[in-house]
């Protein structure tokens, strides 16, 4: 079986290699999805980057739980149980993959992925001088490219079919838990415990998204929850900025702005992430949008522009020095 399909998603093409069984599963918010995957480059050799079968353990994600590589939710929710399919994903969807791959590899090696620290080494890496600790991932981060994901869907579990603390709460308890989780996230953030703060924000988002599924989209109650969710996502992105996970910030803020183009904080945060990965024109465009929507932020915007210009000047000077040394 070899059926090519378009998922009506920009930059994604699907080819079914083995058809699954039964109807399309119900992928409600909070469902746990278990699958095997292989990630390959689009070169002639179809170079394998990661393979969960080689690791010996399948992957699981929770639907609606702010997974780093959001496009995987789109891919998985198009599949039936037992289905095997290949998905070609353009660069717009794969920019964060090196960060995800690093975390998965460190977990497989028995390391704590949250203990990683950024190293700096001049112009060794153009993206905020990161090294991910794996040469192939460093190259992939320097030069983002389309990737192919081969996925085999193994299991889909509803929220009440597996043990997860959040889902032991009823709707009223979930709503009561949100401000507590939000407040705890803020407290941890102020203490500099960004990983733990991000987890609290994620838990609150999952609670709200579950509640939101019970409301009619774009009506008053749904919009109230949406506003709360966006606030928490931006708090989560603030943690990501501190952790220097800039591509995930770009993905989440861009998603917010696609649906809510008037959120000033999302433009401001996206501008900062663009600046860190040397997308100077995009950063300037977002900062101009901040000024247009919120003139009172002029001082903060000018500060970010000065910082960006200074970093660009430093980068150009380092490049000149490097060229001089290469020429002797």
Curated annotation (Swiss-Prot):
Primary localization class, coarse: cytoplasm
Provide GO CC annotations from the record. Answer: cytoplasm; cytosol; nuclear speck; nucleus; photoreceptor inner segment
What does the record list as GO biological process? Answer: apoptotic process; negative regulation of apoptotic process; phototransduction, visible light; regulation of opsin-mediated signaling pathway; retina homeostasis
Keyword hit for Repeat: yes
TPR repeat intervals: 178-211, 230-263, 264-297
Cite the PPIase FKBP-type domain residue spans from the record.
53-145
Q: Which SMART domains match?
A: TPR (SM00028)
Query: Which UniProt keyword terms apply here?
Result: Cytoplasm, Nucleus, Repeat, TPR repeat
A single GO molecular function term of this UniProt record? peptidyl-prolyl cis-trans isomerase activity
InterPro entries associated with the record:
AIP/AIPL1/TTC9 (IPR039663), PPIase_AIP (IPR056277), PPIase_dom_sf (IPR046357), TPR-like_helical_dom_sf (IPR011990), TPR_rpt (IPR019734)
User: Where does it live in the cell?
Assistant: Cytoplasm; Nucleus
Q: How does it assemble?
A: Interacts with NUB1.
| Functional description taken from the UniProt entry | May be important in protein trafficking and/or protein folding and stabilization.
Name this protein carries in UniProt:
Aryl-hydrocarbon-interacting protein-like 1
Q: Which organism is it from?
A: Mus musculus
């Amino acid at each position: 079986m070899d059926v090519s399909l378009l998922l009506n998603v920009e930059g994604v093409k699907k080819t079914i290699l083995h058809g699954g069984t039964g109807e399309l599963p119900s992928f409600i918010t909070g469902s746990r999805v278990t699958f095997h995957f292989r990630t390959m480059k689009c070169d002639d050799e179809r170079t394998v980057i990661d393979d969960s079968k080689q690791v010996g353990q399948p992957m699981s994600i929770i639907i609606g739980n702010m997974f780093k590589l959001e496009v995987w939710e789109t891919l998985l929710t198009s599949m039936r149980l037992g289905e095997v399919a290949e998905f070609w994903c353009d660069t717009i969807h794969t920019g964060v993959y090196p960060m995800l791959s690093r975390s998965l590899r460190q977990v497989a090696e028995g390391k704590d992925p949250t203990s990683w620290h950024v190293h700096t080494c001049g112009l060794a890496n153009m993206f905020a001088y990161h090294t991910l600790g794996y040469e192939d991932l460093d190259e992939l981060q320097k030069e983002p490219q389309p990737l192919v994901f081969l996925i085999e869907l193994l299991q889909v579990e509803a929220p009440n079919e597996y043990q997860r603390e959040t889902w032991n709460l009823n709707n009223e308890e979930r709503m009561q838990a949100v401000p507590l989780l939000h407040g705890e996230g803020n407290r941890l953030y102020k203490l500099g415990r960004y990983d733990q703060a991000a987890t609290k924000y994620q838990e609150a988002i999952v609670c709200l998204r579950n509640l939101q599924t019970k409301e009619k989209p774009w009506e008053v109650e749904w919009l109230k929850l949406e506003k709360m969710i966006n606030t928490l996502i931006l708090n989560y992105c603030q943690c990501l900025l501190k952790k220097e996970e800039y591509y995930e910030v770009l993905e989440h803020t861009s998603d917010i702005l696609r649906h809510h183009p008037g959120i000033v904080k999302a433009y401001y945060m996206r501008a900062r992430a663009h600046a860190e990965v040397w997308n100077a024109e995009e950063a300037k465009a977002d900062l101009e949008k901040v000024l247009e929507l919120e003139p009172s932020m002029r001082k903060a915007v000018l500060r970010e522009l000065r910082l960006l210009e200074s970093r660009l000047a430093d980068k150009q000077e380092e490049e000149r020095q490097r060229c001089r040394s290469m020429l002797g």
